[in-house]
Amino acid sequence: MADYYDLLGVSKDADGDTLKRAYRRLARQYHPDINKDPGAEDRFKEIGRAYEVLSDPQTRGRYDQFGEAGLGGAAGMPDVGDMGGFADLFETFFSGFGGAGGSGGARPRRRGPQQGDDLRYDLKIDFEQAVFGQEREIKIPHLETCDTCNGTGAKVGSGPTTCSTCGGVGQVRRATRTPFGSFTQVAECPSCEGTGQVIADPCPACAGQGVRQVRKKLRINIPAGVDTGTRLRVAGEGNAGLRGGPSGDLYVFLTVKSHPQLRRDGITVLSEVNVSYLQAILGDIIEVDTVDGNTSLEIPAGTQPNAVLTLENKGIPKLGNPVARGNQRISINVKLPIRLSDEERGLLEELAGHHSAKGRQHHHHNSGLFARLFGQKG
């Protein structure tokens, strides 16, 4: 679907009155009972959907941040396709109710305190930050209660008053005649938009909405042991509520960047290290990379290719219990030489002859690394 602002032909900072005027004009133009073009009905539905989203501060805030994906089929959004023909035509021309009333009547908006929406923030962190945790500063766009009017939406010194059109109930009834008979339709009050109150003198700072969109700096604590997909909840840092309602929460979804040498399997760290055939045969002590930095690892004499050695307590801290840590498992890659010097070849041939002289029944290295070095079969 096209951008909602483009559908209504308004700018992204358009106020409520501008949106309403644009919607009424386009609803008259594309109403399927008037406009018989094949695409008129679909366009009429799109216009209605755009107005429903942008006329509500909460859904407008989500749309501005995340687009159509941020709406997620929000419950309570009326389906413009359910609008009745002649009744809607009456509303469109006389009251501007189009898109608000379904075939069974309008659903009133909640007039009391309304909790703000929860927000999502995606954050990428380094491998080491996921292991040991860190405090990070982020900037989030969200709705805050207008500090000029304290969320009332009214200019300082004034306040909301009971809507004279609906008497404060948020709904109006209209009787009309059609070729099919007379009927009464209940619809959202066009004057107060279902709230039961009107603001004659709106706050200039928030255009009467009671909330303003701002970018806020937050410092969040990333605990040790998090992983990709971990969700952190920051209470009260979502969008501000309406009419004194509580704010929603902020949910931070983490993605952990890969490490050039280390991999993760739960709380176990996996890595590989290359050793020479002489180190594998004779044993050695080498330096390996761990999340704690370089650490000494003992290569036992006679280590076979693809052997796995373990460094205890060098893995990932357990989320919620950072004292408990996993292990690091290191796969050993034994590198055999492609080319040998004459001296090396002579020594190896001498060693191979020494082992052959002992006889196969006494040969303890007739498989694995020695077999590969001396061309023997196990």
From Swiss-Prot:
Family matches, as PROSITE patterns: DNAJ_1, DNAJ_2, ZF_CR
Domain of life of the organism encoding this protein: Bacteria
Zinc finger motifs (CR-type), residue ranges: 133-215
Binding site for Zn(2+) 2: C163, C166, C189, C192
The UniProt record lists the keyword Glycoprotein: no
InterPro entries: DnaJ, DnaJ_C, DnaJ_domain, DnaJ_domain_CS, HSP40/DnaJ_pept-bd, HSP_DnaJ_Cys-rich_dom, HSP_DnaJ_Cys-rich_dom_sf, J_dom_sf
CDD domains: DnaJ (cd06257), DnaJ_C (cd10747), DnaJ_zf (cd10719)
Gene3D superfamilies reported in the protein's UniProt record: DnaJ domain, Heat shock protein DnaJ, cysteine-rich domain, Urease metallochaperone UreE, N-terminal domain
Pfam families the UniProt entry points to: DnaJ, DnaJ_C, DnaJ_CXXCXGXG
SUPFAM superfamilies the UniProt entry points to: Chaperone J-domain, DnaJ/Hsp40 cysteine-rich domain, HSP40/DnaJ peptide-binding domain
Subcellular location per the Swiss-Prot or TrEMBL entry: Cytoplasm
Gene Ontology CC terms, in alphabetical order: cytoplasm
Limits of the J domain: 3-67
GO MF entries: ATP binding; heat shock protein binding; unfolded protein binding; zinc ion binding
Binding site for Zn(2+) 1: C146, C149, C203, C206
Segments annotated as CXXCXGXG motif repeats: 146-153, 163-170, 189-196, 203-210
Record note on cofactor: Binds 2 Zn(2+) ions per monomer.
GO biological process, one term: protein refolding
SMART domains the record matches: DnaJ (SM00271)
Record-stated family: Belongs to the DnaJ family.
Stored PANTHER family: CHAPERONE PROTEIN DNAJ A6, CHLOROPLASTIC (PTHR43096:SF10), DNAJ HOMOLOG 1, MITOCHONDRIAL-RELATED (PTHR43096)
UniProt comment concerning the protein's domains: The J domain is necessary and sufficient to stimulate DnaK ATPase activity. Zinc center 1 plays an important role in the autonomous, DnaK-independent chaperone activity of DnaJ. Zinc center 2 is essential for interaction with DnaK and for DnaJ activity.
Complexes and interactors: Homodimer.
Protein name per its UniProtKB record: Chaperone protein DnaJ
Organism whose genome encodes this protein: Prochlorococcus marinus (strain MIT 9313)
Lineage of source species: Bacteria, Bacillati, Cyanobacteriota, Cyanophyceae, Synechococcales
